[in-house]
UniProtKB/Swiss-Prot annotation:
Transmembrane segments: none annotated. One of its GO terms (cellular component) is cytosol. One of its GO terms (biological process) is arginine biosynthetic process via ornithine. Keywords: Amino-acid biosynthesis, Arginine biosynthesis, Cytoplasm, Lyase. Belongs to the lyase 1 family. Argininosuccinate lyase subfamily. HAMAP family: Arg_succ_lyase (MF_00006). This is Argininosuccinate lyase. It comes from the Bacteria. CDD domains: Argininosuccinate_lyase (cd01359). Its EC number is 4.3.2.1. The gene is argH. Pfam families: ASL_C2, Lyase_1. Coiled coil: none annotated.
Length: 457
């Protein structure tokens, strides 16, 4: 059943109908559409369009429909209705007859769909926040269990300075905390109701829109009807949040893919999140992580696509806006799935401490410590940097780590070097000296774990 047609003398071409209809994806807004309709029925009582008895009949029927939808949402797709609004109204009329035709009084699908989508986004943000915090907690637990796992830190994918696996985990906790903050900030701007703005100029009925917003769980009502029905900033913001969040998850995945490789061998992933090869029986592939990394692109694409859709639209509503739903549904579903999968990857991961330690002792990751040692002896840093570079070349020539060079060898480059240099070059000393806030010292890492646990409690 179309909600329009009196103006037309010909039926829509079936090809146009298939092109135009949105039920195949906006059926996901069924619950929100029903909840919004219940609130609207209450508002119509306040302006005398419905009696209290009529409103009760409508609300009872809508609540029955809500339970039917929750029990079997796929039933909606068996209909040839144009969109979810048409489907809900048609089902309501089936249940209460002509009374159902009064519900749309003073309401447009423009403010209706804007309201439905905001309600859906609010619920989805709450799910994302929960999944985000669960992943943060999993990272903190993994960090706590691996505070003593020393490994090389990298810049340019070359060994740079020693860190710990715990410190690595906590880096991603920081990223996820920013993702959490962005979602919470987006929720503030999302939490305003457009219902009652009509097609574009507002409703002709003196409805208390603030009261209506409260019934729907919004903190307030929007202030401009033109903007309200054409605003999709919340979609862009959520897609941006998702795009940034997926970049973080993609980097997390890439790190672990490398750590799990035969070349690094720092971790072993659980059999539960890996797969094999149809040809090579020895393979154990990090498919969960590769899919997280791969799915990042589709989320970036959804953001770019939505920006291009909106950039040239005049006020107010245009059918182009129907393109908002598939992208945001898919992007937020993808982000949510990847948050859950990342947490599952951490459940059962094994950190190979000895392999990590061996790698940290290679690659001259303690070279900066030698430079700092020279600075403490009064050598200007730029000169110390050059001296250590020459010492590294000598160590490479001899096939030794820096700490294995003899004192005589080291003193070829600077006579200020003495026996007290050797304790400075140990991995533990490298870690202990990074004791400023945010550093990799055991004390700082322990404090960071305690802080994160308290924040997430």
């Amino acid at each position: 059943m179309a909600l329009w047609g009196g103006r037309f003398t010909q039926a829509a071409d079936q090809r146009f109908k298939q092109f135009n209809d949105s039920l195949r994806f906006d059926y996901r807004l069924a619950e929100q559409d029903i909840v919004g309709s219940v609130a609207w029925s209450k508002a119509l009582v306040t302006v005398g369009v419905l009696t209290a008895d009529e409103q009760r009949q409508l609300e009872d029927a809508l609540n029955v429909l809500l339970e039917e939808v929750r029990a079997n949402p796929q039933q909606i797709l068996q209909s040839d209705a144009e969109d979810i609004h048409s489907w809900v109204e048609g089902k309501l009329i089936d249940k209460v007859g002509q009374l159902g035709k009064k519900l749309h009084t003073g309401r447009s699908r423009n403010d209706q769909v804007a309201t439905d989508l905001k309600l859906w986004c609010k619920e989805t943000v709450r799910e994302l926040l929960t999944a985000n915090r669960q992943l943060q907690s999993a990272l903190v637990e993994t960090a706590q269990a691996n505070q003593d796992a020393v490994m090389p830190g990298y810049t340019h994918l070359q060994r740079a300075q020693p860190v710990t696996f715990a410190h690595w985990c906590l880096a991603y906790v920081e990223m996820l905390a920013r993702d959490e903050s962005r979602l919470q900030d987006t929720l503030k701007r999302l939490d305003v109701s457009p219902l009652g703005c009509g097609a574009l100029a507002g409703t002709a009925y003196e409805i208390d829109r603030e009261q209506l917003a409260g019934w729907l769980g919004f903190t307030s009502a929007t202030r401009n009807s033109l903007d309200s029905v054409s605003d999709r900033d919340h979609v862009l913001e959520l897609l941006s949040d998702a795009a940034i969040g997926m970049v973080h998850l993609s980097r997390f995945a890439e790190d672990l893919i490398f750590f799990n490789s035969g070349e690094a061998g720092f971790v072993e992933l659980s059999d539960r999140v890996t797969s094999g090869s149809s040809l090579m029986p020895q393979k154990k592939n990090p498919d969960a992580l590769e899919l997280i990394r791969g799915k990042c692109g589709r989320v970036q694409g959804a953001l770019t696509g939505m920006m291009m859709t909106l950039k040239g639209l005049p006020l107010a509503y245009n059918k182009d806006m129907q393109e908002d739903k598939e992208g945001v549904f898919d992007a937020l579903d993808t982000w949510l799935d990847c948050l859950h999968m990342a947490a599952l990857v951490l459940d059962g991961i094994q950190v190979k401490r000895s392999r990590c330690q061996d790698a940290a002792q290679q690659g001259y990751a303690n070279a900066t410590e030698l430079a700092d040692y020279l600075v403490a002896k009064g050598v200007p840093f730029r000169e110390a940097h050059h001296i250590v570079g020459e010492a590294v070349v000598e160590a490479i020539r001899q096939g030794k780590p820096l700490e294995a060079l003899s004192l005589a060898d080291l003193q070829k480059f600077s006579l200020v070097i003495s026996e007290d240099v050797y304790p400075i070059l140990s991995l533990q000393s490298c870690l202990d000296k990074r004791a400023a806030k945010g550093g990799v010292s055991p004390q700082q890492v322990a404090q960071a774990i305690d802080y994160a646990k308290a924040r997430l409690a």
